[in-house]
UniProtKB/Swiss-Prot annotation:
It comes from Azorhizobium caulinodans (strain ATCC 43989 / DSM 5975 / JCM 20966 / LMG 6465 / NBRC 14845 / NCIMB 13405 / ORS 571). One of its GO terms (molecular function) is phosphoglycerate kinase activity. The keyword Zinc does not apply. GO terms for biological process: gluconeogenesis; glycolytic process. PANTHER family: PHOSPHOGLYCERATE KINASE (PTHR11406), PHOSPHOGLYCERATE KINASE 1, CHLOROPLASTIC-RELATED (PTHR11406:SF23). It holds the Pfam family PGK. This is Phosphoglycerate kinase. Substrate binds at residues 22-24, 37, 60-63, 118, 151. HAMAP family: Phosphoglyc_kinase. It catalyses: (2R)-3-phosphoglycerate + ATP = (2R)-3-phospho-glyceroyl phosphate + ADP. Pathway: Carbohydrate degradation; glycolysis; pyruvate from D-glyceraldehyde 3-phosphate: step 2/5.
Length: 396
């Protein structure tokens, strides 16, 4: 039984349901260019309207300093209506007379988008008076924005203390997937952590060494670990000043019985460009004028071998400069191996973080992972073992 209330438990008929969603979508000249986040909230909207509830959507958009017409949610509301295949009304404010008038005219089953919550300073301050004004517009609160759950703002956290609070379908799916991956996982758990810098993932690495059985480190951050072990990495991206930190992480992992897997070979080049001349070498044979841009085939084979025994995989960050072919090979090969094992029922696989989602989509593997989180910052904070205010506020 989940530790939070879901829409299945809510009496929604005729109720004004304030739904915190994430409509902070990419736009170009008034058109939505990626509707992933809109698609994610449709099941929640439908669950509310089918039960006769009035769905009133709250979201931020961008980082406006006060009211800014260029950051209005009006064009996004139109896009929600198109994807929903139903009329979606829009109110020019999220509090005050405009919002009150729009809410008062809603019939059961109707959908309304309120204007950008960040047009008001009270949103990010989680100001009591702003929370109260929002709460006055609803009878029930639903949070369906895991991607904003790491922020203790009025619409993500404050409202949950003022109205009966429930998790939306997308939030529920995310929390259930994450619980299976790290809170009560099937072991062994293998984590893949890649990306450019160790400095941006220190807390994450520290938390994972205590929770997983095998930690595979790739990307630019692997160079820092290799250098800390005395390997010369040439001109590769490397945080030499973090050598002590890397050694500390290796020691912590050993004390927890967590095996760290580093690249054993590398794809090196002298030029940071797609299709640059390159060669594959063991990691201890990188020339002074070369840089590592990907893990090599022996590393891929090693990771595939480790995957055979794993029951759960958590992935954050690519293995190499995946946006520059052919330096995408390791990321693509390992992603496909995880996807195949998941499809065969051998693995539960959870991945997240902006670059990670892009890398898995590039590999054509995202669809076969058990769960791919589009949450970015909230997913990272969860991996770091932090409590997320928006989630904590939903707990029973």
């Amino acid at each position: 039984m989940p530790t939070f209330r879901t829409l299945d438990e809510a009496d929604l008929a005729g109720k004004r349901v304030l739904v915190r969603v994430d409509l902070n979508v990419p736009m170009d000249e008034g058109r939505v260019t990626d509707d992933t986040r809109i698609q994610a909230i449709l099941p929640t909207i439908r669950a509310i309207t089918e039960k006769g509830g009035k769905a009133i959507l709250l979201s931020h958009f961008g980082r406006p300093k006060g009211r800014d017409a260029s950051q209005s949610l009006a064009p996004v509301a139109a896009a929600v209506g198109e994807r929903l295949g139903a009329p979606v009304a829009f109110a020019g404010d999220c509090i005050g007379s405009d919002a009150e008038a729009a809410v008062s005219t809603l019939a059961p089953g109707a959908v309304l988008v309120l204007e950008n919550t960040r047009f008001h300073a009270g949103e990010e301050k989680n100001a009591a008076d702003f929370v109260q004004q929002l709460a006055a517009l609803g009878d029930i609160y639903v949070n369906d924005a895991f991607s904003a759950a790491h922020r203790a703002h009025a619409s993500t956290e404050g409202l949950a203390h003022k109205l009966p609070a429930f998790a939306g379908r997308s939030m529920q799916k995310e929390l259930e997937a994450l619980a299976k991956a790290l809170e009560a996982p099937q072991r062994p758990v293998l984590a893949v952590v890649g990306g450019a810098k160790v400095s941006s993932k220190l807390e994450l690495l520290g938390n994972l060494t205590a929770k997983v059985d095998i930690l595979v480190i790739g990307g630019g951050m692997a160079n820092t670990f290799l250098a800390a072990k005395g390997v010369k990495v040439g001109k590769s991206l490397c945080e030499h000043d973090l050598a002590d930190t890397a050694r500390q992480i290796i020691a912590t992992a050993a004390s927890h019985g967590c095996e760290i897997v580093l690249p054993v070979d590398a794809v090196v080049t002298k030029t940071f460009a797609a299709h640059a001349d390159h060669r594959v070498v063991p990691v201890d044979q990188v020339a002074e004028d070369e840089m590592i841009l990907d893990a090599g085939p022996a590393t891929v084979a090693l990771v595939r071998e480790k995957l055979k025994g794993a029951k759960t995989v958590v992935w954050n960050g690519p293995f190499g400069a995946f946006e520059l072919p052919p330096f995408d090979a390791a990321t693509v090969a390992v992603a496909k191996a995880v996807a195949e094992a998941t499809k065969a029922g051998a693995l539960l696989s959870v991945a997240g973080g902006g670059d990670t989602v892009a890398a898995l989509n590039h590999a054509g593997a995202a669809g076969d992972f058990s769960y791919v989180s589009t949450a970015g910052g909230a997913f990272l904070e969860w991996l770091e073992g932090k409590q997320l205010p928006g989630v904590e506020a939903l707990r029973r």
